[in-house]
Amino acid sequence: MTDDTADPFVVRWLTWCSQALQSHKYPIRSLVDVSSPLSPDTETREDVIARGRCEQWKEDLLRTSPMVRFMVKHLTLIQCNPLSPREDSASQGTPPKLLIASCPPDIAGGFSPSPPERPTAESGILLCANRIFSKAHLEDTISHEMIHWWDHCRFKVDWGNLRHHACSEIRAASLSGDCNWTREINRRHFALSKQHQNCVKRRGILSVRGNPACKSEEMAMKVVEDVWDSCFHDTRPFDEYEFDSI
């Protein structure tokens, strides 16, 4: 089954189920740690097919997606080219910066920030092929994680600081397409006003709640509210951004 031949209803249903259950998780520690989330011996035939399909979608998006190409350009401008080889790429088993892999149920993937002693360009993104069911879903996911990467490179984010984490989650949810009108309707979230803002807050709280430094949902809600005004209106690297409205 390919992106072009898949039953549109099935693709929409699978994508909705994945998005309803999956928020963009607290950044994973290191791509090296999860470079083979499922070994070839444990991958099913469906996992292998999904991984190959996702690799093709990724290559297509890097060539044709205005959003993905924009983020690649602006990451490169701040010396964080996501497509360049790693400094230690000659080492056997070193994963690419954009890693497509099959993942077990407890790994959702996400942005993997570089350790403090390493250049921010050595960060990366893990994309779990068996959790992504359409090219559009992959496009939004890559865009979301690249906004985290841009923040990490531009602002040297401390991901253990809840205010830093909340700010990047607000920006990523708002700017990536995560909270566009159609996506929210597919998630069964509808509001007569401020639908975009409600989505950004909800998804920001979910992500911050997954941070080990966050002790409760109330704490996550308070942190998101505390940084909301400055972070929601910060649209860098975009000059301006048009939010969906109804």
Curated annotation (Swiss-Prot):
Instruction: Name the GO terms of the biological process aspect.
Output: mitochondrial protein processing; mitochondrial proton-transporting ATP synthase complex assembly
Enzyme Commission number:
3.4.24.-
Binding positions (a divalent metal cation): 144, 148
Q: Where is the active site?
A: 145
* Pfam families linked to this entry: Peptidase_M76 (PF09768)
Q: Where in the cell is it found?
A: Mitochondrion inner membrane
Q: Where are the transmembrane segments?
A: none
Give me the Gene Ontology terms describing cellular component.
mitochondrial inner membrane
InterPro entries in the record, alphabetically? Answer: Peptidase_M76_ATP23
For this UniProt record, the keywords arranged alphabetically read as follows: Hydrolase, Membrane, Metal-binding, Metalloprotease, Mitochondrion, Mitochondrion inner membrane, Protease
One MF term in the entry's GO annotations = metalloendopeptidase activity
Q: Give the signal peptide as a residue range, or say none if absent.
A: none
> What does the function comment of this entry state?
Has a dual role in the assembly of mitochondrial ATPase. Acts as a protease that removes N-terminal residues of mitochondrial ATPase CF(0) subunit 6 at the intermembrane space side. Also involved in the correct assembly of the membrane-embedded ATPase CF(0) particle, probably mediating association of subunit 6 with the subunit 9 ring.
Protein's name in the database: Mitochondrial inner membrane protease ATP23
